[in-house]
Amino acid sequence: MNVNEIIKGPILTEKSYQLMSSGVYSFKVSPKTNRSETKKAVEYIFNVKVEKVNIFTVPKKEKKLGKSKGFTTKYKKALVKLMPGYTINLFEDESPQDQKDSETISENTDEKAKIAKKKAELEAKNKEIAEKLAKKQAELAKKESETNENQEKKIENQTENQENSAK
């Protein structure tokens, strides 16, 4: 039997996910296959070492939908235990997606760093502008106080002159 015809696909259930953590993977296999063929197929397709294979036939079950009755199809299931240190990546699309996610995350962090740098520069410029404005306001206040003092002195001088001329 051809290696590609032996394994129909993985069986992904809650129980199979729990078994994956201990190195046991479940596959739907051809009804005509046996343990040794399944072992060779898994080792060839996934490039791993298999410790042991359990195979059993899942019987058909009666299902009802409304008034009609039917049966699920029976199939052969293989539980494949891998040697320690080997794993099978059943979701090949995840790893490139994870890389894309990490790239976008790094790009986002770079963008955030640039934005933070620009914010810091703008805050520094705003601080400089605020200091310049404060200096100008202080200078204007000095000039106004000087002009007020000069005007007061002029008024005092005028009043003194008027008093002196009146005497």
From Swiss-Prot:
Gene3D superfamilies: 3.30.70.330. Residues 158-167 have a biased composition (Polar residues). This is Large ribosomal subunit protein uL23. InterPro entries: Nucleotide-bd_a/b_plait_sf (IPR012677), Ribosomal_uL23-like (IPR013025), Ribosomal_uL23/eL15/eS24_sf (IPR012678). The keyword Transcription does not apply. GO terms for molecular function: rRNA binding; structural constituent of ribosome. Pfam families: Ribosomal_L23. Disulfide bonds: none annotated. Residues 91-112, 137-167 are annotated as: Disordered. It comes from the Bacteria. It comes from Mesomycoplasma hyopneumoniae (strain 7448). The gene is rplW.
